[in-house]
Amino acid sequence: MRDVDIPVENPGLVRWMLLLGQLGKPDTPEKEFLHEMYFYFFGQELLKSTFIIPMRTHGEIPEANENGVTSFKEGMTFDLAMVEGRDKEQALMFFTDWLRFRQKFGEEWQGLMQPLDGNLGLHDVIINGTGNPEAGAYITESIFNKIKEAHKKDA
């Protein structure tokens, strides 16, 4: 099965984001312990997740080849969904699944499937930026590098 044929779903990542959001800012040793545990598992899921990046093309998207790879024609332009960033000027919007993606962008936008790694050099990333901060995450390059370092021994 081609990677492109596998539905984009990240239930493990969504679970840990929701638990972190429900926990809020830890203000007791018990909550601090839970936060560290939740964040560890969040990082584990984050590293293996594939996301949907909202993309609006100006022109027709070519069909994918037999491997599921789409190559854009020379001169084709597209917009990526961005919002004002914290550490960097702009933040890219990433979604864990098509339901959350469509809730925010409807049918007018297409989705570009990407892992998080390699997308933080120029922009921060907002995961599931649907207006409910407790159900999403804001990822900077430094946070992502710390997560990768913490999980090196897991690989």
Functional labels for PLM-detected ranges:
Residues 1-155:
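An interfacial alpha-helical scaffold signature
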